[in-house]
Amino acid sequence: ESVILWQSFDFPTNTLLPQQLLSRNTKLVSSRSQTNHSSGFYELFFDNNNVLSLLFNGPEVSSIYWPEPWRVSWEARRSTYNNSRIAVLNSLGNFSSSDDFTFLSNDYGAVLHRRLTLDYDGNIRLYSWEKERQTWVVSWQANQRPCRINGVCGANSLCKYVVGSGRKCSCLPGYKMKYGPDWSYGCEPEFDLPHNKHESVFLL
């Protein structure tokens, strides 16, 4: 008799496939960037209140940003009473979670190749394979306002959404981008901060 000792479906990375369970013992972790596929700063998991949540787990701060933390669970249409902590996507485009969160894809009902991915920018998106164009298209996403995603532009920065071109990050006056094309590192001062413990500086 054959016994399964290990299977990849039990250990998702940043993506769930149809019928693959997300449970209390698993989570999705975003990649670092579009080209760097090491673990990033965003996680999708069930929190201690049994709610499916998105977490920004940055180098200096950690915070849940979805559902909106200022809402109580019933305002966000979530239930905390079911502690089974299971979520699953089916091949028709229906996602269902034990906290009562559910959604249907824009193309619900069609049998397509699908994947639910926690992207590097902290947004969850459902992708459907469009056979004619031979490409993945977004058929649902959790956050329509990318600037509400925690840490998306890093520290000391501003986030602005431009219709047609998407999210734009910029540094605060007196700051510069810290690391190349990766905005998640944020911005650093263009001026030198004093290292002498007897000196002080006052910033407006």
Feature locations, PLM:
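Beta-rich ligand-binding surfaces for carbohydrates and other polyanions
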Residues: 1-204
